């Protein structure tokens, strides 16, 4: 009855919601700190909340399927024409569009060894072979080597570059990304995932990707962005892709109608306008990131310098699954990375008081179990 390809797919395990912790552990919602899904700990712009309240009565209407207002606002924000933009229910959906639309006959896709899990899921659903870099140590060099070796064996239909990379947090320089795109064949689509780009660009200008420059220089690249992270709209599910007019037109052929809701489009439109809120969130993230790095050094954790709104801790003497379960029982949701084959855990950078509590809990765990 079902496709054989589904047997190869491990169901994606999303970050645990607060409601699940309430049900399983009987902890009051107000006593739970959720730092496992890289949501914006500062919530949503007050302007967005006000707009949603004013427009809630429109929930019965189908959305404007042209997404005219948001597409034009994004076009203005990135200084491109609206014909270069496609909007999806999260940037995940645009990844799905890419995998559905590409010609994968006798082809494969390339991705990093440790990266966003949905790349692999959507590639497998498309029935395409996957090749990964052997490690995460020298990622650009490994991508070059992997591309050169694999293209002799089988056509490469797409390459995923996550910048910054989730769940590790490292980020390629924008110039290095362009260097790689320049080197690949023109019939290979390079998918540049910038879900956390706002944080990276603030921390290091060399990491700042310019989508306009990318699509002007290259006809085989698509840049992905999202409103789920710094814009605080994870629950609204809005993402976007910026690419050549030809790529966008092909993706529209697999896009279902009304794929983003009326209220989600309205929320994203207002969120994009409130750049004061965005700037404050980015600055606060940088301040709190420094606290996490200092804490890691104090406790002897190895950490991966992060350009996102999260940090990944490695500790050879701690079993990450045991630690994450203990933290969960004490009302703290973080992301165990055992499913990636790593003895590591990822923590979203929260508000100051949340982070203080994180430090207290981890210290308490170490005192009990060391």
UniProtKB/Swiss-Prot annotation:
It catalyses: L-histidinol phosphate + 2-oxoglutarate = 3-(imidazol-4-yl)-2-oxopropyl phosphate + L-glutamate. This is Histidinol-phosphate aminotransferase. It comes from Helicobacter hepaticus (strain ATCC 51449 / 3B1). Keywords: Amino-acid biosynthesis, Aminotransferase, Histidine biosynthesis, Pyridoxal phosphate, Transferase. Transmembrane segments: none annotated. PANTHER family: HISTIDINOL-PHOSPHATE AMINOTRANSFERASE (PTHR43643:SF3), HISTIDINOL-PHOSPHATE AMINOTRANSFERASE 2 (PTHR43643). One of its GO terms (biological process) is L-histidine biosynthetic process. Its EC number is 2.6.1.9. CDD domains: AAT_like (cd00609). Belongs to the class-II pyridoxal-phosphate-dependent aminotransferase family. Histidinol-phosphate aminotransferase subfamily. Pathway: Amino-acid biosynthesis; L-histidine biosynthesis; L-histidine from 5-phospho-alpha-D-ribose 1-diphosphate: step 7/9. The keyword Transferase applies. It is an enzyme of class 2 (transferase). The modification N6-(pyridoxal phosphate)lysine is found at residue 229. NCBIfam families: hisC (TIGR01141). The keyword Amino-acid biosynthesis applies.
